[in-house]
C-alpha cells in the first residue's frame, strides 16, 4: 500500500497543466477523495477537508466572480491550508486572481485541464484509488486472454510460468509473473499488476529470466488488468474428483471482491495453455449469457423426459 502520491505524479498521470507552483509539485496527496468547495465559498469552514485535492469548475468559479475581492481573498486564504496538496481548475478556466495570490503565498500548486469537471474528477479519483489502495501480493501469474484477466495460481514448479510463455506465444499478453500485486479499484473490480522490478519478465526453469517485451514486442505485455478469473493448477491425483461438467462454482475472495475460480489438474501430455485459453473463452461466453453446461443439462433433461414418455 502506497501511503502517499506526489502532485507531480498526479500531473503526469492526468496530463494536467501547471499554472503556478512548479517548485511545489513534491507535495503529498494522502487520500483519493476529491473536494469540490461549495459551502466553503460562502464562508462555511466547520468541515473543510483540507487534505483533499480541491477541484474548481464552472459552478465554483462563476460563484467566485460574484464575490468582492476582499471576501474572496479571505475565503481562498482559508482554503490554502498547509496540508492542502493542490488546486485543480477544469474546463480550461482561468483561476481567480485571489486563488493565485493565496496559493502562491502558501506554496500550493494550481493545476489546470481542458477536461470537464466530472471527467477530470473521475480520472483523478481512479488514479488515486489505484495508487493509494491497500495491496496484496499473490504468488501467481497474470495474463490477459481475449480481454479476460486470468490469474494462474498453484504450487511452485507446477508450470505456471511455462504456461504463461505459451500463452504469450499464442498472442496473449503478460501482466505479471511470480508475484501479482492485487488491489481493489472499486466495489466490483479487482486489478492486478506486476511489481516494478518484475515488470515484463518471465522466469523459466532451465533458461532463466527472459524479457517478454524485448522478445515478443510491446503488444505482448500490459502494465495491469482486471482480474476476472482465477485458474488454479493442481498436480493430477487419481483420488481427486475434479469437476467434469462445470457445475461446481468455486470462488476466491480478495478484499471485498469475489472472483470465479476453476481448478485444472496438471498431467504429462496436457496442453495447459490451450486448456486455460478455452477456460477464458468459456468464461467470456458465460458472461455474455451462453452456458454450455446449462445447455447440455437442459438437453439431457429433455431427452430423459422424451424417453420416459415413450415408455
UniProtKB/Swiss-Prot annotation:
Residues 265-270 are annotated as: Important for the catalytic mechanism of dephosphorylation. It comes from Levilactobacillus brevis (strain ATCC 367 / BCRC 12310 / CIP 105137 / JCM 1170 / LMG 11437 / NCIMB 947 / NCTC 947). The gene is hprK. Its cofactor is Mg(2+). GO terms for molecular function: ATP binding; magnesium ion binding; phosphorelay sensor kinase activity; protein serine/threonine kinase activity; protein serine/threonine/tyrosine kinase activity. The Walker A ATP-binding motif also binds Pi and PPi. ATP binds at residues 154-161. HAMAP family: HPr_kinase (MF_01249). One of its GO terms (biological process) is regulation of carbohydrate metabolic process. Belongs to the HPrK/P family. This is HPr kinase/phosphorylase.
